[in-house]
């Protein structure tokens, strides 16, 4: 593995604070630690100055004016130097283990501009033991030393053996040496390259993300591909010259194109019209014959259509008559179905209402009972309330009376009187005149017992009354049922009538049960009756179609006869079909054969024309395809011999051209590289020194120098040695001769001259013998003589080459003609004449058409008979299964009988349906009708008498009770006793009054509550009665409506009615369908007859017009044929292949040619007048005159000295051969020069892919780089969308834009720019020229967009910008970008330097304290992995674990400022090692 070059040390001489200081640089990281002003930036500035000694770039910002609006004159360098000579040197060792010291001598220039003078130099071959400070300083004594100026340094080094000192006048040479020796990574050819390198170093020095670099990453990372641009420029220049030549050839071809165009268009114009007239004459004859045939056929068709029209009209009238009857039957059936459906719906409603009425009846009876009970309770409540009211009133009156009695003191007397009155009333009621107050209690018990007895008797009578009332209601119910069923009758007749109704109900139920079987039987018989009627209709229709009446017994025999006739007709029809198919097949085969022959005929005619042309061109007659192929092989052999000779002549011509070009080089150099090497070495070509040698001396000097005649004469060979190292771009043998080019002679050789030869003694043991060359080339005179002879030879070769090219071109055209003939016409050229075969096939086709017409007429009659027989068999097939129905005469009577029985059963069913419920209710209670409960009135009277007796007993008992209660009143005899009892009675009356009022209140409340309940019961009752009456009324209405409908509503009635309606609808639909068919057919027949009539008239008119036209055109055609034959142009005008084109195509062809001819002869007055006269369509012979005039005009313009032929067509062919040869030669040259757009796209795309892969490899080295929150750094390389679209179009869709790249007015760069503008119209191109834009588009770098991204914390990947990162993160990210750029430069420059060189890698970092320990460790790891050296500057607190650390402290001692430096290498277990190279205190190290 090649070791990477390293910077060993940095030496500062006479810098501010550093007199002679050498810093040994660590292989990885060198840290400069110190406070502000310690000299860290000065040390780094010295390094940068030695690396890039360009004063236009150097600018150390941290020491210039902060905030200045203009740049400092010092730019930071002048103030870092001391007066006198200063040095900054870099000691390096490269991959070849060569020690190289490069550096600069700096010196302040006096003046206010504060300028600095810089001189770069390099030292090679310096021993390792010599330190850089020893070279540039001279020790005066122990305490003093002197800095050597540059000239003394040069003398000192020249005195040292093996040491080379080089001073450079240009920075380019200085950097070129550094690149070649592996000190810098990139060859810096220009100021732009140096600026990029300085920006890189500056960015690394000050840290962070440099916007100057990130904005132009493409320039830093992507190499320029200038070779592609140069190749395109050369290509465009050659193409421009070639196109100019081709344009000149096209101008020359214009005359040839005009002649060819005139002949071609004139031939098309006249031949198309000539053949159109010939075709029209033949077509008119064919049309006349066709019109005559069609006229005869149309007359026959019209007669057949007339017969057909009469038959269909008769059948249509029959169907129209039958349709009215079917419509009436169908309407009646539909109405009947609607009535049945209505009756069924009415019946369903009746049944539903009857069920509702029964339910309402039950609810009504229940509600009547509830209302009766409520009324009784209401009466009791009213009586109780009335009694309570009376008692309250009585007590109040008693209390009022008592109060009054108190006032008059007569109360006792009143009570006594009342007691006496009560006793008298009891006596009166009880009829006890002896009743006293004392015996009243005994009589009270007697009358209470009597009251109890009367009450018991009344209750017994009440029970009997209830039972009698029930019997009376049952009798009334049964009587009402009988009245509802039978009508009004006497009550004594109810029993007999009820029994009769029950017996009749049983019979009616029995009949009603027979409704369904009778209905099914009737439906079956009606179906059979309808089938019988249909069979009778079919039989009548069949007899009508056959034109004869047939008996039922004759139908089977007739059926067999018709089947036999169908079989025979089917065989004949089948045979006729096969015969017709055979005829049609033969006709189709003939037609297909004729069509194929007509399609082949133009091809065969074209093949014959091509074959005749070939025979004329080669003078051979070809009778078979073998003759053609044999002649083609001979032609190929001749062509191959001519091509070989032409290529030999061409190769010799090219060799002569190359030799002329080589000899025409200035100075006689045959290799351009020699001129570049001579300029590089500072020498002169030997051929230039002897350029003036005479032609006679040229052979001697050429033999004298031999192979070294192309040597380079240099003043000093030792100075050329360094240029020869790694020199690859040179001839295999490069001769160098030391000498003065101004006074060079041939004394460098020891030579003996012989006869036409010399012997050169190169060394004591090496001689060279060289003869004089026959054609000397040494010297300008010899070269010019050789060039003259070569030019003469080139003229001969060019003439011979042109002759051979013409012959080859002619042979190739003949070969192409044969190839085209073989590829297109050989397969048909030697076949039989298709037109003769077409004529034979046409005659056979006419015979087939005549036979087919006769066969069609015969077959039509058989087909009609066959169809009639098939219709008869079809009708019989429908009639024969119904013969038994036709023979059944009693079917209608049986239907009537069953219908009558069904009517009786349906009447019984209606009776049962109407009165079934009443009979069912009457049957369990019919027995109550046997006796009429007339004693019910007597029982009612007894009950009323019992009630009166009970009331009388109650009154008597009450009167006795009152006497008993007033028994005390009888003792009131005086008023004193009466007054003494006033107080007690008053209180008792008041208590009874309160109790009576409370009782009255309760009675009123009970009366009101029960009254509300009674009202609700009455409302429910009224609602039920209303609903019952409404439904009863609706039921009666529905029954009346059902009776009014007059239709039997049973379960099968609807189905029967629907079947009947559907049958009639099917018959009506069939009749209408047949009628519509007949109407359409009749309309079509009438239209066909009208069309045939019009067609007959038109055919008659067309036939007579065509006959007249044929006769009229015959005279004009004869005149045209005479003119064609007289002028001998029939061969060119009678193009038989045009006979197969239509008239429109020929007319279009002629019109197009006419338009082209008007333009072609616009400048020729004679041809223009003849052409205008030929446009008359009524005078076709004038077109022939125009064609003859064109041929005569072209014959007069053929140059017989160049083209010896009288035929203009042949002359054009010869001219075309020569011009085609020249065009092909130049076109092939242009194709060699041109490059396709797809190739351009591929080159650019491959370059982009290569660079993307390279960037991807660079990204891999930065995957694990992390600074702070930045976890990784990467570089994104994307193709711009607009440019990607351009590449896609160039590679995939370039055919759509060939108008740009095939344009002769645009170069490739301009076409590319135009395409870019076409694809991106939104982009403003400004004032830039398309050529400039196109050249930019040829640079692949303009297609790419590059940006740096960092993976930072939770933000993920984002664009690397200083504002989005911390200071340390920005420094680390910027360092990663710079490392990537350096690595990219190395990869880019690897092919430019030696393979055994691996350049040095070194970057800077000032103010590294902004990085944390982890970031510092990452930098160390990055340096170790990439073998990169890093110089960082940091304050006191930086203490790296690896590398070398220098502690800088600036001190002032005796008015002298110097920097105290202490260095230590890493952290080792032992004590820090003092580094060598310190020239101050013993503890200091450098």
Swiss-Prot record:
GO molecular function: ATP binding; DNA binding
GO CC terms in record: cytoplasm; nucleoid
Pfam (any one): MukB
Coiled-coil features, chain-numbered ranges: 326-418, 444-480, 509-603, 835-923, 977-1115, 1209-1266
Main location: cytoplasm
Gene Ontology biological process terms, A to Z: cell division; chromosome condensation; chromosome segregation; DNA replication
Entry remark concerning the domains of this protein: The hinge domain, which separates the large intramolecular coiled coil regions, allows the homodimerization, forming a V-shaped homodimer.
Subunit-structure text: Homodimerization via its hinge domain. Binds to DNA via its C-terminal region. Interacts, and probably forms a ternary complex, with MukE and MukF via its C-terminal region. The complex formation is stimulated by calcium or magnesium. Interacts with tubulin-related protein FtsZ.
Name recorded for this polypeptide: Chromosome partition protein MukB
Native source species: Escherichia coli O139:H28 (strain E24377A / ETEC)
UniProt gene name: mukB
